[in-house]
């Protein structure tokens, strides 16, 4: 298929792929030439698609008659980026046997830029010729559709064996996965959240599905997401979550498309094995709750109800609405205050009205009730508030002591729960009511957890920290992840997310630990502040190499930048919340405490202040 009419100033692709509705630069650098294999050749780069909109469909172009080995290699690499059913065009570049047996499935190798490919000398007795394909490996997407960032800066290397049959060159050994540049990956795939239960709370599990129908299954994005949900959690999250779907539960055979009806209801037909055929209503409703939150994140339409059906599409197993699913999901409260430390080192709270016009005054911030309101000589440095807003954890202004105070009753300041000879980080509460803090003292550095905010502090083992030093942290609202700012020898701070593993049984004395740290903001060379944000994202203030300060929403798996905030220069602290109706709050060198109403510019709350936070 050829590209349609060529717009002025844009070159249509000579070979490789055609894009419906628009002509853009070809991904491959394709050469005309004879069919004989060159004895030697220079490195050639197959560049990524530049500026290709995710709404543009890409179709592969089959190999020309007697195409050169160069064209075969380039054409195949480019055809892997197409939207062809069953990747049928890419298979035309393969031998018959290779085309039948090539099953990349959902696995993808993501490269930071284009591919280098060049011919290499093969064995004297080997039939045909070999080409080496290399690139900088950014990540892989595994069979569970989960993004796995490459932490070692590794190189991708693959050898393609070419053979000649009836005067036609073909590839006999294709790669085991799809190989895509980062830009092509973002054009073809989109991030979605699946939801599983972690200690009674719904937890998001980020994965990637195709923007359009999957080439193999022909499922639309919603159906792909449901299928991924039924298959189970990602390997990284799996140890700390469970699913309500019984083993053997599948989509009804032939299900390719799922969509909301006129009543904003999604009906999902399921094939149940004998064990799952008589699932209890309570468990079925938890299954439907997982689906409702998963699809609610995926669709722009309002989803009000999810109905699970048997495979015949006639018998209803159970259903949930937004209202009935909310208690089962057990998410954090939506109506909360914003908090910060004012210029007099007092912890204050406010309730910002996002509906107010810019000229309308907001309610004046007030000191939090309880001992902090009457402790005239105590100076607060940083703070964290429980999700029920009944207790506050504060670190003294000198950074030496951690205190937990009640905000519902008056009384004297309690003694310190944890003391440091150096400095303590800002604290953080998780959804279980446990308190987290890092000790920055070089002689005693580490991560500490205070069970229930009242127990004896416990030092937490953090696997993979190596020689890094934790300087900041934030537990996720679901309580199964923790974001850590880690400083290493060069003085820069990088952001990692670790999995919180807790004892499985009551009475189990094995310690809580943090496992499998993975980079959450690899695009940032230095991170200054961060906060958890809606849908399991992170709001990060930092700099790229040689860049200016930016505030970006990042996906917690480190895969891509979701969005950016305007006017981030000078920000020193940031606070966001699980409920998207709540505005972002921040501290600024020049303007003090500021907040960002939806669709507006930053507004000032107070001329002085620091450490803005939401509960958590």
Where are these regions (language model features)?
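Bimodal "functional hotspot" detector
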Residues: 2-13, 21-24, 28, 35-616
């Amino acid at each position: 298929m050829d590209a349609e009419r060529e717009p002025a100033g844009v070159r249509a692709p000579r070979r490789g792929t055609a894009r419906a509705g628009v002509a853009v630069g070809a991904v491959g650098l394709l050469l005309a030439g004879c069919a004989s294999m060159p004895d030697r050749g220079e490195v050639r780069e197959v560049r990524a698609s530049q500026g290709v909109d995710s709404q543009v469909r890409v179709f592969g172009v089959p190999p020309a008659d007697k195409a050169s080995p160069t064209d075969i290699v380039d054409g195949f690499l480019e055809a892997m980026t197409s939207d062809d059913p069953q990747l049928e065009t890419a298979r035309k570049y393969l031998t018959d046997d290779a085309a039948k047996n090539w099953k990349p499935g959902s696995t993808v190798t993501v490269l930071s830029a284009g591919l280098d490919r060049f011919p290499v000398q093969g064995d004297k007795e080997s039939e045909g010729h070999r080409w080496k394909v290399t690139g900088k490996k950014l990540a892989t997407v595994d069979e569970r559709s989960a993004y796995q960032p490459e932490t070692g800066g590794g190189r991708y290397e693959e050898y393609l064996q070419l053979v000649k049959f009836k005067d036609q060159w073909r590839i006999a050994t294709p790669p085991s996965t799809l190989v895509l540049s980062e830009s092509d990956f973002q054009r073809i795939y989109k991030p979605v959240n699946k939801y599983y239960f972690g200690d009674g709370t719904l937890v998001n599990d980020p994965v990637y599905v195709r923007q359009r129908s999957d080439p193999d299954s022909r499922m639309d994005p919603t159906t792909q997401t449901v299928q991924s949900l039924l298959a189970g959690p990602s390997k990284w999250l799996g140890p700390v979550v469970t699913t309500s779907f019984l083993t053997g539960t599948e989509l009804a055979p032939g299900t390719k498309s799922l969509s909301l009806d006129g009543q904003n209801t999604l009906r999902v037909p399921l094939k149940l094995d004998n064990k799952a055929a008589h699932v209890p209503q309570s468990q079925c409703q938890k299954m439907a709750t997982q689906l409702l939150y998963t699809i609610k994140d995926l669709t722009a339409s309002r989803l009000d109800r999810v109905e699970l059906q048997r495979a015949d599409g006639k018998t209803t197993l159970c259903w949930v609405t937004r209202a009935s699913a909310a208690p089962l999901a057990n998410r954090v409260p939506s109506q909360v205050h914003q908090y910060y430390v004012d210029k007099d080192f007092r912890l204050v709270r406010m309730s910002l009205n996002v509906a107010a016009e810019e000229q309308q005054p907001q309610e004046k911030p007030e000191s939090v009730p309880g001992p902090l309101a009457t402790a005239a000589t105590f100076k607060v440095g940083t703070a964290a508030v429980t999700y029920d807003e009944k207790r506050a954890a504060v670190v003294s202004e000198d950074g030496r002591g951690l205190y937990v105070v009640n905000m519902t009753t008056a009384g004297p300041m309690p003694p310190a729960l944890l003391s440091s000879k150096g400095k303590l980080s800002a604290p953080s509460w998780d959804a279980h009511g446990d308190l987290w803090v890092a000790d920055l003292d070089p002689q005693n550095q580490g991560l500490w957890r205070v069970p229930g905010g009242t127990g004896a502090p416990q030092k937490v083992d953090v696997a993979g920290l190596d020689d890094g030093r934790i300087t900041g942290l934030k537990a996720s609202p679901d309580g199964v992840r923790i974001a850590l700012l880690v400083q290493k020898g060069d003085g820069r701070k990088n952001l990692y997310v670790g999995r919180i593993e807790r004892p499985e049984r009551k009475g189990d004395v094995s310690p809580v630990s943090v496992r499998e740290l993975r980079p959450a903001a690899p695009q940032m060379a230095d991170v200054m502040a961060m906060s958890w944000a809606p849908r399991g994202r992170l709001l990060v203030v930092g700099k790229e190499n040689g860049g200016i300060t930016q505030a970006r929403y990042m996906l917690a798996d480190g895969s891509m930048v979701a969005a950016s905030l305007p006017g981030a220069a000078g920000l020193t602290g940031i606070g966001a919340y699980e409920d998207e109706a709540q505005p972002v709050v921040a501290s600024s060198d020049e303007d003090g405490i500021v907040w960002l109403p939806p669709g507006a510019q930053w507004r000032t709350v107070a001329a002085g202040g620091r450490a803005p936070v939401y509960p958590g």
